[in-house]
UniProtKB/Swiss-Prot annotation:
One record GO biological process: arginine catabolic process to succinate
Catalytic activity: N-succinyl-L-glutamate 5-semialdehyde + NAD(+) + H2O = N-succinyl-L-glutamate + NADH + 2 H(+)
Annotated NAD(+) binding sites: G220, S221, A222, S223, T224, G225
Keywords: Arginine metabolism, NAD, Oxidoreductase
Pathway: Amino-acid degradation; L-arginine degradation via AST pathway; L-glutamate and succinate from L-arginine: step 4/5
Protein name: N-succinylglutamate 5-semialdehyde dehydrogenase
Lineage: Bacteria, Pseudomonadati, Pseudomonadota, Gammaproteobacteria, Enterobacterales
Length: 492
C-alpha cells in the first residue's frame, strides 16, 4: 500500500512500477501508481480537511511541524540511507540533505512571520491591518535530485500557512516520498491535510488538471514546467510556482589561487554528479597564461574523480546519476557537442556498463555555433574562452535560462558590474554556484522560473494577502466630501 489518502494507506490502481538502485540494480520499492479516480479522491480529502486545518491556531500547526522535525532527527540515519540508495548519491551527501530538511522547519516558521505575518498601522480613526490567508488545496510536485529536501521546502511552509496538500514525488524516487510521508503521519497530521499519490506523467497530468485545485508548486525540468504553465493558462485563480533548471555560467576572470578556483569549479559543476539545478554548465575562462594553467589543473583534478556506490568506504565525492538512462543522455550530449566542433578536454566515461556511474566530462566550445541552449543534467562542463570582461557577461547572459551565475575574481568592481548586468536570480562572487543561503530567496528568471522564488520567499506563494481598514466605532466624519448635505430639514 503506497498511497496515503485521507489518512489511510491504500494500494494504487494504476500502472505497476518498481524502483531500483541505479548502480547495483537492487530492487528498493514496488507499488502502483494512483489512477485518475484516486487522484481526485486525494483532492476531495484535502478539500474536506482544509476548513478545519486553516482555522487551527498557528501554534497548533507549528507544533505538528516541529514534531516532524524531531522525527527527522530521530530517523536521520534511516532516511539518509533511503535517499542515498534510491538516488545513488553518497551517504555523506544524503546526510546533508536530511540536515537541510530539519533546518528548514525553524527557517520556515521565521519566514512565515517575517513574510506573511500580521502587520497593523494605526490611523487617526482606526487601523490598517495586513493579514494572510491560505490558498486552499495545493499540489506539490517533487524532483528526484533532492527528493527529501526540495519537496520539504514547499510542504512545510504550505502547511504552516494553513493549506492542505497533495504530494506527488518523482516517479524516480517513490521510496523517499513514502518514507517522508510516514514521518508526517507519525507527527500527527489530521486525515486529509497531506495526501500522497505516486506515479509518473499520467498521474501528474491528472493532478494538474483538477478543477478543485487552488495551486501547484513545482520543482523540476523546464520542459515539464512549461507544460504545466500551458495546462494552467487561463486560470488566474490558481497559484503556480515553478522552479526549473538552468544553463548556468561560471566566469573565471582571475584565478590567482588556482587550486582554490579549481575546487570552487568542482563544487559548482560536479557535485551531486552534476544533478543540481544551480550547477555550472558553462565555464567562461579568460584567455591567457593564467587561464591556461587553471584549465590544465581543472582537467587534472577532475580526471581523478571516481564515482562510487552510496556506501563505499572511503566515501566518493560523487555517486551515480539517477539512472543509467540519465548517464547515457550525458554521453549523447557530449558526442553532440563534439560533432558541432567541440574539443574534448576530459572525456566522460561510464565506469560500468548498465550502471549510472559516470566520470566527469569537460569540452571546449570556443567559437562553436549552434550549441543547444539546454540543461544537461549531469557531470558535463562546457568551456568558452573570452578576452574582455564585457564579453564574459555577454556570454553569461546568452541563454534563455536565468537561475545562477558566478564570478571568480579579486576585483569588487567586476562583481558590481555583474550584479547590474547579470540576468540570474542567484549571483555569487568567489563562492560555488551550488551554494545558497536558506535565509535568501531561491529561484530564477526566464526559463528557470516564473518569479515565484522559494526558500525564504516560499511563504509568499503559500498565502494571499488580505488588507483591512477597521474601526471599533462607526462615526460621521467631521468634514464631509463636497456635494454631500447632511443638514436636517424642518418638517413642513
Amino acid at each position: 500500500m503506497t498511497l496515503w489518502i485521507n489518512g489511510d494507506w491504500i494500494t494504487g490502481q494504476g500502472e505497476r512500477r518498481s524502483k531500483t538502485n541505479p548502480v547495483s540494480a537492487e530492487i528498493l520499492w514496488q507499488g502502483n501508481d494512483a489512477d485518475t479516480a484516486q487522484v481526485a479522491g486525494a483532492c476531495e480529502a484535502a478539500r474536506a480537511a482544509f476548513p478545519c486545518w486553516a482555522r487551527q491556531p498557528f501554534a497548533a500547526r507549528q507544533a505538528i511541524v516541529e514534531k516532524f522535525a524531531v522525527l527527522l532527527e530521530e530517523h536521520k540515519a534511516e532516511l539518509t540511507a533511503v535517499i542515498a540508495r534510491e538516488t545513488g548519491k553518497p551517504r555523506w551527501e544524503a546526510a546533508t540533505e536530511v540536515t537541510a530538511m530539519i533546518n528548514k522547519i525553524a527557517i520556515s516558521i521565521k519566514a512565515y512571520h517575517a513574510r506573511t505575518g500580521e502587520q497593523t498601522s494605526e490611523l487617526a480613526d482606526g487601523a490598517a491591518t495586513l493579514r494572510h490567508r491560505p490558498h486552499g488545496v495545493l499540489a506539490v510536485f517533487g524532483p528526484y535530485n533532492f527528493p527529501g529536501h526540495l519537496p520539504n521546502g514547499h510542504i512545510v511552509p504550505a502547511l504552516l500557512a494553513g493549506n492542505t496538500l497533495i504530494f506527488k514525488p518523482s516517479e524516480l524516487t517513490p521510496w523517499t516520498g513514502e518514507t517522508v510521508i510516514k514521518l508526517w503521519e507519525r507527527a500527527g497530521l489530521p486525515a486529509g491535510v497531506l495526501n500522497l499519490v505516486q506515479g509518473g506523467r499520467e498521474t501528474g497530468h491528472a493532478l494538474s488538471l483538477l478543477d478543485d485545485l487552488d495551486g501547484l508548486l513545482f520543482t523540476g525540468s523546464a520542459s515539464t514546467g512549461y507544460q504545466l504553465h500551458r495546462q494552467l493558462s487561463g486560470q488566474p485563480k490558481k497559484i503556480l510556482a515553478l522552479e526549473m533548471g538552468g544553463n548556468n555560467p561560471l566566469i573565471i576572470e582571475d584565478a590567482e589561487d588556482i587550486d582554490a578556483a579549481v575546487h570552487l569549479t568542482l563544487q559548482s559543476a560536479f557535485i551531486t554528479a552534476g544533478q543540481r539545478c544551480t550547477c555550472a554548465r558553462r565555464l567562461l575562462v579568460k584567455q591567457g597564461v593564467q587561464g591556461d594553467a587553471f584549465l590544465a589543473r581543472l582537467v587534472d583534478v577532475a580526471g581523478r574523480l571516481q564515482p562510487g556506490r552510496w556506501d563505499d568506504d572511503p566515501q566518493p565525492f560523487i555517486g551515480g546519476l539517477i539512472s543509467a538512462q540519465a548517464a547515457q543522455h550525458v554521453i549523447e550530449a557530449w558526442h553532440q557537442r563534439e560533432a558541432l566542433g567541440g574539443r574534448t578536454l576530459l572525456a566522460p566515461r561510464k565506469v560500468k556498463e548498465g550502471t549510472s556511474l559516470l566520470t566527469p566530462g569537460i569540452i571546449e566550445l570556443t567559437g562553436v555555433t549552434d550549441v543547444p541552449d539546454e540543461e544537461v543534467f549531469g557531470p558535463l562542463l562546457s568551456v568558452w574562452r573570452y578576452d574582455h570582461f564585457d564579453e564574459a557577461i555577454h556570454l553569461a547572459n546568452s541563454t534563455r535560462f536565468g537561475l545562477s551565475c558566478g564570478l571568480v575574481s579579486t576585483d569588487r568592481a567586476q562583481f558590481e558590474q555583474l550584479l547590474l548586468e547579470a540576468r540570474a536570480g542567484i549571483v555569487n562572487w568567489n563562492k560555488p554556484l551550488t551554494g545558497a543561503a536558506s535565509t535568501s530567496p531561491f529561484g530564477g528568471v526566464g526559463a528557470s522560473g516564473n518569479h515565484r522564488p522559494s526558500a525564504w520567499y516560499a511563504a509568499d506563494y503559500c498565502a494571499w494577502p488580505m488588507a483591512t481598514l477597521e474601526s471599533p466605532e462607526l462615526t460621521l466624519p467631521a468634514t464631509l466630501s463636497p456635494g454631500l448635505d447632511f443638514s436636517r430639514r424642518e418638517a413642513v
